[in-house]
Amino acid sequence: MAPFIPSSHTAIIQHDDAGGVKITPGLPLPVLEPGQVLVKTAAVALNPCDFKMPQRFSQAGTYNGCDYAGTVVQLTEEVEKNGLLKVGDRIFAACVGNNPHDKDSGSFAEYLKGTAKFCWKIPDWMSFEEAAGLSGTCIATACMSLFQSLKLPGTFEEPATKPLDVLIWGGASSVGTTMIQMVKLLGHRAITTCSPKNFELVKSYGADAVFDYRSPTCAADIKKLTRNSLKYVVDPFSDLRTMALADEAMGRSGGKYVALESYQDTHDKKSKLIERELIMGQMILGRAIKLPGDYGKPENPEMGRWGVECYKSVQRLVDDRKLRPHPLRILDGGLEAILDGLEMLKRREVAAEKIVVRL
């Protein structure tokens, strides 16, 4: 029997051009484009971008939220023909939420639209909450950073035979533990920073070496460990302090620095040897990102084709239990709990955990 699909639903959307969001009932269901599916949302995960993006790129009526897990309830004709998904499939992925050019794209909703070729099927043994917690946003960001920006040798199927050192700043964050796992799966050494209380946590995800980011000798200690040869850095924070420390830890010949936030270059002598790049997870889709400043990106169909193959590789990792979510803090309460969780993130009350909300 076909699943019941209502004529309207409730979602969290921006209610003004100042970045405020609120729960809004009576909204029409998302309009599906070719290749998309309608998903009944079961769980969502929260990211800092979920409160930052409405503040930076505000436009009334735009849906909020990225990471989700749920059940497919409707297919477009293209998906019916290609057979990528079927009604009843449990899937997880990430929407491009807070998108002023695709306003009803967002996961903080009773129903959402997902692109079939950029979704993963949830194994029978995995819960919706765990799947949402794997975070499509973190996975896409990690893949873009490690493969497309750093261009590390090796694949998940055929890891590198000569390990390289990769510094992941902030390893106790959800993107940090995702990066650590993927660096190890690619056959490389994962070096990271965090608070001493989280040393054992990041080691449990595979970190080979971990340093206290507050230590006055942090960068020097990393440089000593890597014998002044570190060439690869990923920095989720990308502020002047973390950039300066990353530069100091980098080897004598410089290297590649991946920023996950818009950054201001230090323009010191060392920085001339360092190539910097801003990476966002949604770049993996190959679509144009129509945002101002550094966040704007042109359409890249070749990237999108690579992204599809990358998602297939990640599906195999998930199926083989080689990728696990960040420690979860699960909240009940539906959309109201999402708003509570966003406030917790704003107040920096969440550390070394991923907030997941059941809908």
Swiss-Prot record:
Pathway: Secondary metabolite biosynthesis. CDD domains: enoyl_reductase_like (cd08249). Substrate binds at T137, C138, I139, A140, T141, A142, C143, M144, G281, Q282, M283, I284, L285. One of its GO terms (molecular function) is nucleotide binding. It comes from the Eukaryota. NADP(+) binds at C49, D50, F51, K52, S195, P196, K197, N198, Y213, L260, E261, V350, A351. Keywords: NADP, Nucleotide-binding, Oxidoreductase. Induction: Expressed exclusively during fungal penetration of host leaves, the time point at which plant defense reactions are triggered. InterPro entries: ADH-like_C, ADH-like_N, GroES-like_sf, NAD(P)-bd_dom_sf, PKS_ER, Trans-enoyl_RdTase-like. Its EC number is 1.-.-.-. Trans-enoyl reductase; part of the gene cluster that mediates the biosynthesis of a tyrosine-derived cytochalasan acting as a fungal signal recognized by resistant rice plants and leads to avirulence in Pi33 resistant rice cultivars. The first step in the pathway is catalyzed by the hybrid PKS-NRPS ACE1, assisted by the enoyl reductase RAP1, that are responsible for fusion of the tyrosine precursor and the polyketide backbone. Belongs to the zinc-containing alcohol dehydrogenase family. Monomer. This is Trans-enoyl reductase RAP1. It comes from Pyricularia oryzae (strain 70-15 / ATCC MYA-4617 / FGSC 8958). The gene is RAP1.
